[in-house]
Design a protein with these regions (language model features):
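Short Pro-Gly-centered flexible turn/kink motifs
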Residues: 151-170
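N-terminal amphipathic alpha-helix/helix-capping segment at the start of soluble metabolic enzymes
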Residues: 153, 183-196
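A short, polar/charged loop/turn motif at coil->beta-strand junctions and beta-hairpin connectors
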Residues: 112, 134, 192-194
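Short acidic, Pro/Gly- and aromatic-enriched capping/linker segments at domain boundaries
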Residues: 134-154
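Polysaccharide-binding surfaces and accessory modules of carbohydrate-active proteins
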Residues: 1-131, 147
Length: 276
């Protein structure tokens, strides 16, 4: 814990760092409070600021759109600022992801080179700022997006930023990714060390074209393959507006009788008989 106090104003910022040596992961966040007589408005409040000294930096980010999820792109970070942000609120990760990779001296690679992976524990509007200064050093600033996010902080109230979780590797992004996986299983996921059920989703097999008999056969095949769970995807609903394509049916949440005359209960029975 590092405590910072302003010399002129009754404002304090506490920097928190938790290290997980076994997983080689660090979790960090900030707390802000003040003792002014009236509330103070916070306009910017980063989770942390990381500062690197090197010769070359390469950023890998992930953009998305419908049916084009996680499009990876890499670019060098040169003098000035590069910002990744979103203002979509609850759909924050629709077009860009709150996750990035950094490569030092070369683009991040799977099995070699120095790499850093980072993500923010925040599902709303976020902002990552990467700034290379006049002497070639790099600042990384992960934060809640300050756009329309001013916060009125009352005296002696504590404002806590989202956590920023990151890891380093000298052996590429593969090792760094496994670090984060291990950390998530050990400290973040409920029952992270437990067994996970395998799942068969019918979408890539049937798309919108299925009926009760076909789904029942898929469930039997799922059990034969050792799969534990069957997931019925799109196309099961709509009578007035049948969901036979992706341009109809949304909002008509009745089970489609032409495809599933027995309704969901018939599928449940088929699943029980198949043992999934």
């Amino acid at each position: 814990i590092i405590q910072l106090k302003d010399n002129q104003y009754p404002v304090e910022v506490t920097l928190h760092y938790i290290a997980y040596p076994k997983e080689n992961v660090i979790k960090t966040w900030s707390e802000i409070k003040h003792a002014e007589k009236k509330p103070v408005t916070l306009w910017r409040y980063a989770s942390t600021m990381l500062y690197f000294s090197g010769n070359e930096y390469y950023l890998t980010e992930f953009s998305s759109d419908w049916a084009k999820e996680a499009q990876m792109s890499t670019q060098p970070l040169l003098f000035g600022k590069k910002v990744i942000d979103t203002k979509l609120g609850s759909r924050a990760a629709m077009h860009t992801h709150p996750f990035f990779e950094l490569g030092f001296e070369q683009p991040a690679q799977e099995a070699q080179g120095r790499a850093m992976l980072g993500t923010i524990g925040w599902t709303g509007n976020f902002q990552f700022t990467f700034e290379v200064d006049n002497v070639g050093n790099l600042r990384v600033i992960p934060a809640i997006n300050p756009y329309a996010s001013d916060y009125e902080l009352k005296p002696n109230e504590v404002f806590t930023t989202p956590e920023f979780i990151f890891t380093f590797s000298n052996n590429g992004t593969g090792e760094a990714s496994r670090n984060l996986h291990a950390w998530a299983r050990n400290y973040q996921l409920k029952d992270g060390q437990g067994d996970r059920m395998t799942l068969l989703n019918n979408w890539e097999n049937t798309y919108f074209k299925f009926n009760e008999e076909l789904l029942a056969e898929l469930m039997k095949e799922a059990k034969h393959l050792g799969v534990d769970m069957f997931l019925l995807d799109d196309g099961w609903f709509g009578n007035k507006h049948p969901r036979n394509s992706d341009n109809a049916g949304l909002g008509d949440w009745e089970v489609m009788r032409s495809k599933l005359p027995g309704g969901i209960p018939a599928l449940v029975q088929s699943a029980k008989e198949a043992g999934v």
